[in-house]
Amino acid sequence: MKKEAFYSQMPDGTEIYYEKSGVGEPLFLLHGNGDSGGYFSHQVPLFEKYFTVYVIDSRAHGKSNNTQPYLDFPLMADDLVQLIAQESLSDVTILGFSDGANLALVFSVLYPQKVRALVLNSGNIFVSGVKFWANWWSSAQLIWFWLGHFFIPKYQQKLSMIRLMLHDSGVSESQLHQIACPTLIIVGYRDLVTLRHSKFLARSIPQASFVRMKGENHFYARRNPDSFNQEVLAFLNSVGEVEK
């Protein structure tokens, strides 16, 4: 299908890049930390048959810039609500991976009326929800890029991304209880997010379903897209989000 590319200007002058294709109700795809919308290259060809798919480069990622000296999830959530307004949408379904899932959760708490359904692939609201070695690696990267940014200015942007992984999202357990839309928590058997935390999310969100795929890791959608895509479509079909 025909794909269109756009830049959406935010009130602070930041330009958010996104690609749009397909027909049907809107589906936002939100990538993980340090990545871009290209992560979903194996999802778009199928999903665009059922949805108008918006593949978004989050602020400071991919082709999107950031005019602010900081980066956090509420700021990124505000970008999404601006994009929704500019596209004249009322509400959207969101599929988020890793930090994209965290962003989807923050967005759902801040703008609950804008969310039809959620697919949360390997998200975590607390840093403690990620396995120790992954947090250790993020901390090591933080030190490396902090030292490097004195000599290479562009490392400052990388620092802001890494800090996202080393701070809690700001979503509380009580706020999870208030998420009213149908939600799928989907993770790999060998995920970076602990099983305990993923089950906690599924238990805390009233209309949540939980899928844990054997043989898969944090990058399930990229490693085994056919399986991942069918799980997502089956869920969205079950809650009435897939157009016949």
Language-model regions, residue ranges each:
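Conserved HGGG/HGGXW glycine-rich cap/lid loop of the alpha/beta-hydrolase fold
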Residues: 14-63
